[in-house]
From Swiss-Prot:
Function comment: Represses a number of genes involved in the response to DNA damage (SOS response), including recA and lexA. In the presence of single-stranded DNA, RecA interacts with LexA causing an autocatalytic cleavage which disrupts the DNA-binding part of LexA, leading to derepression of the SOS regulon and eventually DNA repair.
Superkingdom of the source species: Bacteria
Taxonomic lineage of the native organism: Bacteria, Pseudomonadati, Pseudomonadota, Betaproteobacteria, Burkholderiales
Keyword Mitochondrion: no
Name of the protein this chain belongs to: LexA repressor
Species: Cupriavidus necator (strain ATCC 17699 / DSM 428 / KCTC 22496 / NCIMB 10442 / H16 / Stanier 337) (Ralstonia eutropha)
GO molecular function: DNA binding; serine-type endopeptidase activity
Amino acid sequence: MATLTPRQQQIFDLIRNTIRRTGFPPTRAEIAAEFGFSSPNAAEEHLRALARKGVIELTPGASRGIRLKVAHSDSEMPDQFSLPMAGVMQLTLPLVGRVAAGSPILAAEHIDRQYQVDASVFDERPDYLLRVRGLSMRDAGILDGDLLAVRRASEAANGKIVVARLGDDVTVKRLQRRGGHIELIAENPDFTNIIVEPGEEFSLEGIAVGLIRSSGF
């Protein structure tokens, strides 16, 4: 593994710990705020240095597009995008593909397969994996074809990335409540946010607790 400078090690640890705690990497702005950098551009320079050393991979144009490629030998935390590894505790989770209108998300006809994942990847245990369709959450590091790890829940705090059912559609968005209004926020300026109208059929199917990159599936 490449040798990191003390500052690079600190930033790598922040990325790793943020992923472990939230399931998603920090933004450049969050890294800059944590270390007192004058702007997110300074954080970007450190990230590029880490990428050159081969310990992370950057997704262009995505504010959370940071992927760990390796973990330090003194850490027991695996890469959050790793395939299942021998000798570690495995979870068997249903992989949900397309969801038909009006039917439960875990209905048998929606399950593409059962998939094994490393249990230590997630701070919170997920109940299922959902294959992401589209790029509306690109800037959160969630890309088309990725597998989103989801914990079933009917309530979620503001700012959480959720799986929501709106009428006959199921979507992945960031939840925002303002007073009595609900808005589903896209993490891509090319997509409009969804405002839940009063009386509109709406429910939460779960909260995102992690992500598995789609490469290799």
